[in-house]
Every structure is written in structure tokens, then in C-alpha cells.
């Protein structure tokens, strides 16, 4: 009788341990991870395009983040903040690519600085793919941008002394895609792997911008006659 009681108690303890272990595994699977993308972005060596460009980073662009709530799927949820890295990267590339660049922060900047056009980048979409095997930390990230070139007057709201993008009519508008992949399967953490994939995607975006810009419809005509952009 005593032996049966002890066996029952032992089984009970094992069952409780098993339940605890399963609970911990479920909680681990449903945790969330946050990445604030940061990396090194070398200045590209290119012959500058002979125009003066204002660059406008919207608040949405500066604060861009990818949020994937995977709790319903029993997977890890991700929040990947790319905004700061986006601004840092493009703030390095644009001044190297154009002869003169002014970063537009306000209505007063548009009134003060004489630029041929204003370039407005927008992150249209970011997607990611997780590894098939948990011990292989290779992530993939896709980015898609919409870029617009517009005459400065198009975004000036004189009545409210502000910048308005509501009714702008760009004379050049085009999509830009980028892809990044963690270059090694031996990263120390998933967070590091996602960060590096995002950095690679940003660098790819820059390379694609440099090689495709002069082929965008309307751009060459504008470069030849910046005063006559339509």
C-alpha cells in the first residue's frame, strides 16, 4: 500500500514537471523579439549627378518598423525597427550620389534653400522569412520602396506655412526593391541574424538605386533641364 502511494506521488511529481516543461516550451515559442536595425554603411564611390536635390524623410519613414504578431501561430513574434537605419543609410548615399543635397525638415527649409527637386522615399513593404531549422540562423528580408521626385512648389502649403504631400504630382515616380540574407549560418543569436539581413537589404537597395536611377522615366529629361521639370 505504502509502495503504491509512493509510486503515485512520484508519478504526480513527474507529471507536474512535464506540464511545467511543456508550459515553458509554449511560452518560449510565443515570445516576442525586437530588433533595432543598425550597421555600417560605407559612402559609395560614384560620379555625382549634377543636380541639387532636397531630400524629405517623412515621420513615417523615420519611424518605420515591421511588426509580425505570430502569437496566434504559436511562433516567435517580431518587431523590426528599420527607421533609424533607413535615415542613416540614405543620408550617406544621397550626398554621394547627387552634386548637392539638402535635407528638408520644415517649410522654412523649402523657402530658404534653392533645390531643383525634392526626393521623397517611402518604405512600401518589408517582409521576412525565418529559417526552416531553428539551429540555422539564416534570415531573409525583402524591402520595397516607392520613390518620388517632385518640384518644391508642389509640396508647399502657403496658406498653412507647412509641407503637404496630399496633392503632389511627381514628375518621376518609381518602385525600388531590395533583398538581404544573413550571410552566415553561425550567428550567435536570431536578433543578430535578422539585423544583418536587414543591413544587407539596405545595401542592396542602395546598389539598385545607383544603377537604376538614370533609367527612370523623366529623370534624364529633368537632369538636362532641371528648370523645366513637369
Kindly give the residue locations of the regions a language model identified.
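Sec-dependent bacterial lipoprotein signal peptides
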Residues: 1-30
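A structural "domain/chain start" motif
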Residues: 30-92, 211-230
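Surface-exposed short loop/turn segments
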Residues: 31-36, 106-173
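Short acidic, glycine/proline-rich loop/turn micro-motifs
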Residues: 66-71, 131-133, 185-189
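Short secondary-structure boundary motifs at beta->alpha junctions and helix caps
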Residues: 74-82, 152-212
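Sec-exported extracytoplasmic/periplasmic mature domains
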Residues: 94-103, 206-218
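Surface-exposed patches in mature extracellular/periplasmic domains of secreted proteins
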Residues: 102-109, 219-223
Amino acid at each position: 500500500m505504502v509502495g503504491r502511494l509512493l509510486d503515485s506521488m512520484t508519478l504526480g511529481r513527474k507529471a507536474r514537471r512535464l506540464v511545467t516543461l511543456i508550459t515553458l516550451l509554449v511560452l518560449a515559442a510565443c515570445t516576442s523579439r525586437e530588433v533595432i536595425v543598425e550597421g555600417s554603411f560605407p559612402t559609395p564611390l560614384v560620379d555625382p549627378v549634377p543636380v541639387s536635390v532636397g531630400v524629405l524623410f517623412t515621420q513615417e519613414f523615420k519611424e518605420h518598423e515591421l511588426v509580425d504578431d505570430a502569437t496566434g501561430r504559436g511562433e516567435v513574434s517580431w518587431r523590426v525597427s528599420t527607421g533609424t537605419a533607413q535615415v542613416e543609410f540614405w543620408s550617406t548615399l544621397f550626398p554621394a550620389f547627387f552634386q548637392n543635397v539638402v535635407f528638408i525638415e520644415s517649410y522654412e527649409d523649402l523657402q530658404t534653400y534653392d533645390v531643383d527637386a525634392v526626393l521623397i522615399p517611402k518604405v512600401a513593404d518589408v517582409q521576412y522569412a525565418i529559417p526552416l531549422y531553428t539551429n540555422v540562423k539564416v534570415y531573409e528580408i525583402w524591402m520595397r520602396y516607392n520613390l518620388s521626385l517632385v518640384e518644391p512648389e508642389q509640396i508647399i502649403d502657403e496658406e498653412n506655412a507647412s509641407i503637404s504631400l496630399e496633392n503632389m504630382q511627381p514628375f518621376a515616380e518609381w518602385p525600388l526593391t531590395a533583398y538581404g540574407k544573413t550571410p552566415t549560418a553561425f550567428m550567435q543569436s536570431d536578433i543578430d541574424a535578422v539585423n544583418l539581413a536587414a543591413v544587407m537589404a539596405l545595401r542592396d537597395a542602395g546598389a539598385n538605386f545607383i544603377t537604376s536611377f538614370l533609367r527612370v522615366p523623366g529623370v534624364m529629361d529633368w537632369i538636362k533641364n532641371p528648370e523645366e521639370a513637369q
